[in-house]
C-alpha cells in the first residue's frame, strides 16, 4: 500500500473549477475570444460560408452536453445516462425532417466533409468512379479534388462550366457520365452562384445507373426558406452543413427519402466514420432548426438572396467582372483578372479596410489556390446583422473603392483608401450592433 496521504479535493481540482469564468481561469484564451468578438462587431463579414448565430445557439453549444458521450442513436445508445441526449437529438432529427420535408435525417456528422465522406462510405467502394463539379468551376474539395480523400480513394471525374456563361455544362456532364459510368454523381459546390437543374442531373444519373447526391451546404438555408429549388424529389441523398445560410452551429447533416439508403447512412456515420456525436453541437443544431421553422426565417432567406443580388449588381455597375454575370443565391464571385489584381492581394486589402471575404479560384484560373484570380462575397452574415439593400449597395461601393485603389496604386500605396473605407465600415457596423451582452 502507498504511504502517501489520501489526496484532498484541492489537490485534484483547481480552486473555482465549477465557478471561475474563462477570463480568470485562462486569460490567454479569453484574450483571443475577446479579440474575435471585437472583430465580428467591427468588421463586415462577407465570407459566404459564415454567418452569425443566435445567443440561443451559442448557449446550447456551450452547454453541459459537451460532457456527454452518446454513441449510437436515440433509444439505442451504448452508454447509460443518455435520455437527455435522446431528447435533443430526436428534436434535431424531427425538426430537420419537417424543415426539408424529407423522410430521414442523420444529424450526427461533425462537418459537411464528414457528411460527404459518410455518404461515400455508405454507397460506394474505394476505386469506384464518382463525378463532381471541379474546384475551379465552383465545386468543393470533397467532390473529387485530387488533394482530398475523395480524389485519392476514388476514380474522380470532374465536370465543369461552359466558358461563355459559366453555367454547368450539361453536355459535358452527359458525355462524361456515359463514358465513365460513375457509381455516384455529385452536384453542389462552394462557389457556384446559380441555381442547379436537379431534375436534369437525376435524369443523367438514372440513364447511367448512378446514384445522385446533392451537397446543399451553401444553399440549405435558402431551400429551408423557400427561395431556392429543393433537391428533394430528385436526389437519392442530400448532404449539408448546418451553419452557412442555415445559421446554426458548425456541423453536418445527411438526409434522404429512401429507407434503405438511410440505414446505410446511419451505419456509415456510426460506427463507420465517427464515434460519439458531439451532443452540445447536436443540441445547437436542434435550436437552429427550430429557429429556421419560424416565419421570420423565410423573410431572412428572401433578404439574403435580395441582398446578394443588390451587392452583385452594384459591383457590376462599378466595373466588376462577375462569374456567370450575377447570382441566384447568397454569393457572388468576382473575377479580378481584368484589373490585374490577385485574389490574395484583394482579400488582404479588404480586411485591412474592415471587410472580410476570401480569395477564390475562378473558372480556368491560371493562379494557384493560395493566390487565385478572384474573390467570393456573400450576404448571409450581413443580412443576419440587419443590413438591407441600401447597406449592401454601400458595401459594394466600399469594395469597389478598395479594388480600384489597389489596381491603381498597388498594395503598398492603397493605405489612404483602406483607412477611409475602414472608418465607413465601423460607422455602418455601429448602426447594426451584435451580441450587446458580449
UniProtKB/Swiss-Prot annotation:
GO terms for molecular function: glycine hydroxymethyltransferase activity; pyridoxal phosphate binding. PROSITE patterns: SHMT (PS00096). Keywords: Amino-acid biosynthesis, Cytoplasm, One-carbon metabolism, Pyridoxal phosphate, Transferase. The keyword DNA repair does not apply. Residues 361-383 are annotated as: Disordered. Catalyzes the reversible interconversion of serine and glycine with tetrahydrofolate (THF) serving as the one-carbon carrier. This reaction serves as the major source of one-carbon groups required for the biosynthesis of purines, thymidylate, methionine, and other important biomolecules. Also exhibits THF-independent aldolase activity toward beta-hydroxyamino acids, producing glycine and aldehydes, via a retro-aldol mechanism. This is Serine hydroxymethyltransferase. It comes from Rhizorhabdus wittichii (strain DSM 6014 / CCUG 31198 / JCM 15750 / NBRC 105917 / EY 4224 / RW1).
